[in-house]
């Protein structure tokens, strides 16, 4: 994938002193593949550098890690593109991840971030990630850190010593943006750098008309679960909420049935016109206990 060229494009160039970035990257790849900790690698490998070399490499603010991640992902996708068969879908997935970080002085860490894994609020980093998935592979394309109002440190505390045009400053300054803004910016960067996909999958947090409209303008059909609440959508016609639309259609539509594990369900779809989004497809899936609603801007 011409990794040396990608490193140069991402400003990974050798300085006056130190080791070439390409060699250090290879060491990190080896640690990842062999599942070795850095301390173990340094202790047991004759070719390892001193630990300070790896720490300086990671902390270097001039390296554009985001560009390196996107360009390398796009290059890998081009290599595996011939493996795709007709009918297989390529997906971009926007997801939120909570990474526990207990320290008070960690950049971007926040208090009272809800963790679905631990089922409680914890001190953590709130990470918005853009991932790629198909029938053969899945990997991360981009990510951003979102800082909420319960931040542990002020932004000025870790940007004051950085040049305002540096990659590090720009990256650390974006954490006050909204999740929707971060997600759209990541999607736009990925598409501009040659990442190709058929659909964008998001959770109910991003299932808002303005976000879906912006994704459609970038050429990405959106599939998402909608929150089944009393929220009023600007649908054209008499019925405005999900339950109202479901009740009006459930007796006049042919229902299909299925089973997932021990859960039996019935579902049907309908084409509805929205004031902002135009014609969209809604899929209503009922498990007997819960009603799940999904939206797709691809009505084919």
Feature-to-residue mapping (PLM):
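Gly/serine-rich nucleotide phosphate-binding loop at the start of the catalytic core
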Residues: 1-67
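Single, function-defining residue in the core of a domain
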Residues: 1-11, 72, 87-88, 105, ...
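Conserved aromatic-histidine-acidic binding/catalytic patches
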Residues: 29-33, 42, 118, 171-178, ...
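Glycine-rich, histidine-containing beta strand-loop boundary motifs that form or position
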Residues: 45, 142-143, 224-226
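Active-site-proximal, Lys/Arg-enriched surface segment
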Residues: 60-150, 264-270
């Amino acid at each position: 994938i011409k990794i040396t060229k990608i490193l140069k494009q991402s400003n990974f160039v050798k300085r006056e002193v130190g080791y070439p970035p390409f060699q250090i990257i290879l060491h990190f790849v080896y640690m990842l593949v062999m599942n070795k900790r850095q301390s173990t690698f340094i202790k047991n490998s004759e070719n390892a550098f001193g630990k300070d070399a790896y720490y300086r490499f990671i902390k270097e603010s001039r390296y554009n890690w985001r560009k390196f991640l996107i360009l390398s992902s796009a290059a890998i996708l081009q290599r595996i593109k011939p493996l795709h068969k007709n009918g297989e879908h390529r997906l971009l997935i926007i997801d939120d991840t909570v990474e526990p970080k207990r320290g008070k002085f960690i950049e971007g860490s926040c208090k009272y971030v809800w963790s679905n894994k631990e089922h409680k609020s914890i001190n953590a980093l709130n990470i918005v990630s853009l991932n790629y998935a198909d029938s053969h592979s899945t990997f991360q394309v981009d990510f951003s850190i979102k800082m909420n109002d319960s931040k542990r440190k002020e932004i000025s505390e870790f940007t004051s010593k950085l040049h305002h045009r540096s990659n590090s400053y720009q990256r650390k300054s974006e954490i006050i943006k909204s999740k929707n803004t971060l997600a759209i910016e990541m999607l736009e960067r990925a598409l501009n750098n040659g990442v190709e996909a058929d659909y964008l999958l998001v959770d109910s947090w991003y299932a808002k008309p303005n976000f879906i409209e912006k994704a459609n303008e970038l050429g990405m059909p959106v599939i998402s679960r909608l929150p089944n609440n009393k929220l009023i959508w600007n649908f054209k016609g008499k019925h405005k909420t999900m339950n109202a639309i479901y009740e009006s259609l459930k007796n006049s539509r042919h229902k299909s049935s299925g089973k997932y594990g021990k859960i039996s369900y019935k579902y049907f779809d309908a084409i509805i016109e929205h004031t902002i989004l135009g014609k969209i497809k809604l899929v209503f899936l009922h498990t007997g206990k819960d009603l799940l609603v999904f939206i797709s801007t691809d009505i084919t």
